[in-house]
Design a protein with these regions (language model features):
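Glycine-rich helix-loop "coupling/hinge" segments at transmembrane-helix boundaries
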Residues: 118-120, 148, 196-209
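Short cytoplasmic-facing helical segments at TM-TM junctions of multi-pass membrane proteins
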Residues: 143, 147-182
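Generic hydrophobic transmembrane alpha-helix motif, especially the helices
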Residues: 103-139, 146-147
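Transmembrane-helix boundary motif in ABC transporter permease subunits
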Residues: 72-102
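Periplasmic/extracellular loop-to-transmembrane helix junction in inner-membrane transport proteins
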Residues: 2-3, 32-75
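Hydrophobic alpha-helical elements at and bordering transmembrane segments
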Residues: 50, 59-63, 67, 97-104, ...
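Transmembrane alpha-helices
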Residues: 130, 134, 166-200
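Transmembrane alpha-helical segments of polytopic membrane transport and secretion proteins
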Residues: 1-20
Length: 209
């Protein structure tokens, strides 16, 4: 018991020492002035900027705008992606077309959508939302389609023998059985949505001047 306790404290101490060394190395490199201060600020300068941004409310405002973009884009991606994934699992033609497109687009880095968003929407909220939706959509489509295809057919047959109709089977049998796959796709879509939004917020203002 005591040995495990000291082992846990030792792991925490190692982590703390590591981060202290990282901050010290950061400060040391900053003091060397190899790079301009605006390219490589010191930890103290970063802390001061964050503190002043928090005090004047700009940090809170920027965080709220970012979260609003993220939640809205992610929500649209889910509302669009889950039904499309269901269609892919149900119809082979859609799987052979939209499914393949989704597989290809999912592999694209999020930043690839930024130039298109800028050309189509300019420096607007629409450009930001488009990039976030594209980051979310494809993972959700693929996960939903894969999950519904992997539901054992015996589940639906058992429900139909008890008088369940197609809609009831879909809502109460197929969707719950495929939930682990769908949730996994939602998690991946959330991670990709964050990554997409970061790329959009950095590059859209740059590309539009």
């Amino acid at each position: 018991m005591n040995r495990n306790k000291w082992s846990k404290w030792g792991a925490h101490a190692c982590s703390l020492v590591f981060f202290i060394l990282v901050v010290w190395a950061w400060q040391y490199l900053s003091d060397l002035r190899v790079w301009k201060p605006y390219l490589f600020p010191s930890p103290l300068e970063v802390w001061e900027y964050l503190r002043s941004s928090f005090q004047d409310g700009s940090l809170e405002e920027a965080s709220w705008i970012t979260m609003k973009r993220l939640v809205l884009g992610y929500g649209i991606g889910l509302v669009t992606g889950i039904p499309l994934g269901m269609l892919c699992s149900r119809f082979q033609l859609i799987q052979n077309t939209l499914g393949l497109v989704s597989l290809g687009f999912q592999a694209l880095p999020s930043v690839c959508w930024v130039p298109l968003a800028t050309l189509w929407f300019g420096q607007t909220e629409g450009a930001m939302l488009f990039v976030v939706i594209m980051g979310t959509l494809w993972s959700v489509i693929l996960a939903t389609a894969n999950g519904m295809r992997n539901v054992p057919p015996i589940y639906a047959r058992a429900a139909r023998t008890m008088g369940a109709g197609p809609i009831y089977c879909l809502i109460h049998v197929t969707l719950p059985a495929s939930a682990p796959f769908v949730v996994s796709g939602m998690k991946q879509g959330w991670a990709f949505a964050w990554r997409s939004l970061m790329a959009a917020e950095i590059f859209v203002p740059i590309l539009t001047g």
